[in-house]
Curated annotation (Swiss-Prot):
A motif (DXD motif) lies at residues 211-213. The chain crosses the membrane at residues 23-43, 265-285, 288-308. Contains three transmembrane domains, including a tandem transmembrane domain insertion into its glycosyltransferase-A fold. Transmembrane domain 1 functions as a signal for Golgi targeting. The conserved DXD motif is involved in enzyme activity. It is an enzyme of class 2 (transferase). The gene is Pgap4. The lineage of its organism: Eukaryota, Metazoa, Chordata, Craniata, Vertebrata. GO terms for cellular component: Golgi membrane. It is found in: Golgi apparatus membrane. GO terms for biological process: GPI anchor biosynthetic process. CDD domains: PGAP4. It comes from Rattus norvegicus. The keyword Transmembrane helix applies. This is GPI-N-acetylgalactosamine transferase PGAP4. InterPro entries: PGAP4. Residues 1-22, 286-287 are cytoplasmic. Glycosylated.
Amino acid sequence: MTTSTSPAAMLLRRLRRLSWGSTAVQLFILTVVTFGLLAPLACHRLLHSYFYLRHWHLNQMSQDFLQQSLKEGEAALHYFEELPSANGSVPIVWQATPRPWLVITIITVDRQPGFHYVLQVVSQFHRLLQQCGPQCEGHQLFLCNVERSVSHFDAKLLSKYVPVANRYEGTEDDYGDDPSTNSFEKEKQDYVYCLESSLQTYNPDYVLMVEDDAIPEEQIFPVLEHLLRARFSEPHLQDALYLKLYHPERLQHYINPEPMRILEWVGVGMLLGPVLTWIYMRFACRPGFSWPVMLFFCLYSMGLVELVGRHYFLELRRLSPSLYSVVPASQCCTPAMLFPAPAARRTLTYLSQVYCHKGFGKDMALYSLLRAKGERAYVVEPNLVKHIGLFSSLRYNFHPSLL
């Protein structure tokens, strides 16, 4: 008499045969401990990790960020109030040159009082230019004030030290009477004005357009020097319309509709997989080489890097300017954009042909022009600026948050 054995019973019987020393059990335990215990404990406060506990930390981290920004804003204000000027009138923050190699144009509006965003940005650029020394003699700071009211205190203070272009100086304040011009179109027009003013005033080789809530990273000038003088001489990078220096960290994960990142992700697995396999085989005293084990560690490392956060692994590239990567740009966002002079003139023509509105801001307009005009654009990774503005100049935000 034969008795049938159920699939569940057969599975249990096979599981009982597995010993704690078997490869399958060890790798299963490693997976559970890594993704169920160690990684969540280590990463629950990392803002751009899948393990981040938003409900536990976000509100407090946002408040701490705002408080720190207030302190840094006050420090930047004192920095300029105490900054001496030669003969009491000659600016010392910038060194005038007949034709600068790079103009750094900072676009500013009157934002939330107390944070002094534009002062933070300009003071950081000033410090970095001083540290850079003779290598940055061809760099020119330029402030573009697009605030319609005359109450922009920070812009007035900076005018003692930095050349300023005021879009609405000496004009009638009748902008609000035109119902066809919304805030998104105005932002685009402001951008066009500042880019055009930079070209007309200095005729530089490059224009770096920086919004007044984008603080430069410490490595920005050595990296730009390397990129523009070495990397952008490569044929596939020549004649680019623009180079983005910032992409939101929350959009830097591998699981994104960008093919280049998928290739990079697979490359991470192919690099770390064999290394982890060798370590496992050595310490587990396993003879020979196992393709299934290597495949496991390839997938294991890919999953770990994605869940911890690609953003944090990109930070390793800051070890050297040559390690920064340049990849095709996506549509969001425009805190810092570098334009070669010929491309900047093409951009002015392109932007004059589009109209911006809610859902189609200047960043989307610039990105849409790439395909329409057959242009190319790139983004540098990791970011070369930090976005510190939680208060948008386009949207009211009474409860700002880091995410």
